[in-house]
Amino acid sequence: MGYLKKLALFISVIILGIFIIGCDSSSDTAEKAKEDSKEEQIKKSFAKTLDMYPIKNLEDLYDKEGYRDGEFKKGDKGTWTLLTSFSKSNKPGEIDDEGMVLYLNRNTKKATGYYFVNKIYDDISKNQNEKKYRVELKNNKIILLDNVEDEKLKQKIENFKFFSQYADFKDLKNYQDGSITTNENVPRYEAEYKLNNSDTNVKKLRDIYPITTKKAPILKLHIDGDIKGSSVGYKKIEYKFSKVKDQETTLRDYLNFGPSDEDS
């Protein structure tokens, strides 16, 4: 009888040990799943805006509201900020950066901004050379407000299209095995994906911009701020075609919703 009690106790200890190990293993698996889900959290955070792409008529944004928090004043409907820029090194030690910024105020239903032409030098003794040309959006068309004598530049500005107007991210959920970087203290999150040249958005970018490298780009999804949403932080997309010195080639896109500027 004493033997049976000891055997029962021994078996109970073994079962308890297996249970504890199983719990630890389940805990590790759950923790790993939580770790792995950060990529999904980043994609879901971006999907809130990327699901709207392509936004063929930018004025549709007047009727769309983004993430709101305590930073908004009572009655403020918010402002959408768009930016698309293309930067490329055409000469050693120099990077040419061109693009457009547009502010769509949902209170006034007015959209104003500027086209910029920027030259960045490696040599810090040289002044960064940036020119801005004021624009507004009317009837989904870019109207140039400043006098531009260069006809080629004038046409480029008036025919400018934001990446958000032609990009399509319906397959975003299928992007897998991204390189994930997180810093919860800042907070900051990044997911990088190696694309191929058959990607729909990549082909469109190659049609529009003078991308000379044949290398397929890396897509970077970058979040500054709360991954669940924040009007203080921002999100941006980057297509890095080349990071090689004096061959740098990058497309940047930014679409964010935030409080309106009192002066706008």
UniProtKB/Swiss-Prot annotation:
It comes from the Bacteria. It is a lipid-anchor. GO terms for cellular component: plasma membrane. A lipid is attached at residue 23 (N-palmitoyl cysteine). Residues 1-22 form the signal peptide. Keywords: Cell membrane, Lipoprotein, Membrane, Palmitate, Signal. It is found in: Cell membrane. A lipid is attached at residue 23 (S-diacylglycerol cysteine). Its main location: membrane. InterPro entries: Csa, Csa_sf. Transmembrane segments: none annotated. Belongs to the staphylococcal tandem lipoprotein family. This is Uncharacterized lipoprotein SA0397. It comes from Staphylococcus aureus (strain N315). The lineage of its organism: Bacteria, Bacillati, Bacillota, Bacilli, Bacillales. The gene is lpl2.
